């Protein structure tokens, strides 16, 4: 009968291996595993597999998929369902006005960290030349974003992790900034190259004992070295401030990212090292996130 045939047709459509059905199955799996942005993540990963933008995915949802695309997509979805950050699965993360390459050797750039870029550009909007040091440069997102906007600024980035620097250099080449920046593998204590108008840093600032309470996708996949701020969360901040007080020019500025509850401790450390506090800037969630200070 016609109704049976119609039922059969509709059943067939469920098993058609097209974009929409694969995304729906992925959505169900991610939801089951408590992934908040299940739909968006499914679309982003499909875009990544097909090398098309999300608009294409949505407009061509009935397009059939090749077996290879399906297996690659399902593999990514399985990894996402176990909490692996989406940026590590696609190898990319949007930050400020650009896309940065990332992998598990670098922290995933956060929207909160864009505050540093925004504030630097605001403070120095009339400045044509400037030397910048980025301590713990990671993917390069802060330093490279600033220098892309201010073509006559020169930058130096240091990181203790060679693999982070490799990723940073990759981003530098991608953004065609090779002649504007230099990188050194060094820990903060032993670095003694140059004097700077401006130092920026997003150091590890999470209390070691609290690391285990972070969201599982952060603690399981992101580099611990980029998160662990010692027993009081301030050990790397102290080192950055110490070193900055040596390497910064008189009246030079330090832009420092901090944890939401570290404002008073950080202010004291800065004042003890001869810094004047210009302002503390809040992030989108209204938490204290960035301290701007001047070496006097």
Residue ranges: model-predicted function:
Residues 1-16:
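N-terminal amphipathic/basic-hydrophobic helices that include classical n-h-c signal peptides
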Residues 17-69, 73:
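A short N-terminal interaction module
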Residues 30, 124, 172, 244, ...:
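Conserved hydrophobic residues forming the short capping helix/wall of the S-adenosyl-L-methionine
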Residues 45, 83, 113, 142, ...:
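Residue-level signal for inorganic ion chemistry
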Residues 48-123:
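Conserved AdoMet
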Residues 114-213:
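Conserved SAM/SAH cofactor-binding pocket of Class I
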Residues 205-236:
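Mobile active-site "lid"/loop adjacent to the S-adenosyl-L-methionine
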Residues 231-294:
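Conserved Class I SAM-dependent methyltransferase catalytic core
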């Amino acid at each position: 009968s016609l109704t049976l045939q119609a039922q059969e047709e509709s059943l067939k459509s469920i098993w058609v291996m097209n974009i929409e059905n694969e995304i729906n199955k992925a959505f169900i799996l991610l939801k089951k595993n408590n992934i908040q942005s299940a739909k968006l993540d499914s679309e982003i990963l499909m875009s990544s597999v097909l090398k098309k933008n999300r608009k294409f995915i949505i407009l061509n949802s009935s397009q059939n998929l090749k077996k290879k695309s399906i297996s690659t997509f399902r593999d990514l979805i399985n990894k996402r369902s176990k909490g692996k950050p989406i940026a590590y699965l696609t190898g990319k993360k949007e930050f400020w006005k650009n896309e940065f390459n990332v992998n598990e050797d670098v922290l995933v750039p956060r929207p909160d960290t864009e505050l540093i870029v925004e504030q630097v550009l605001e403070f120095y909007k009339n400045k044509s030349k400037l030397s910048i040091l980025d301590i713990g440069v990671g993917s390069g997102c802060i330093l490279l974003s600033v220098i892309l906007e201010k073509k006559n600024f020169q930058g130096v980035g240091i990181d203790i992790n060679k693999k982070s620097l490799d990723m940073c250099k990759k981003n530098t080449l991608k953004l065609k900034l090779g002649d504007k920046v230099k990188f050194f593998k060094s820990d903060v204590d032993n670095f003694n190259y140059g004097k700077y108008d401006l130092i920026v840093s997003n150091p590890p600032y999470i209390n070691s004992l609290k690391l285990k309470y972070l969201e599982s996708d952060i603690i399981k996949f992101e580099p611990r070295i980029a998160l662990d701020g010692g027993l009081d969360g301030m050990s790397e901040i102290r080192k950055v401030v110490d070193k900055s007080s040596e390497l910064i020019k008189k009246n030079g500025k330090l832009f420092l990212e901090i944890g939401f509850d570290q404002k008073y401790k950080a202010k004291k450390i800065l004042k003890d090292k001869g810094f004047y506090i210009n302002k503390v800037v809040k992030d989108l969630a209204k938490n204290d996130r960035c301290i701007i200070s001047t070496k006097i």
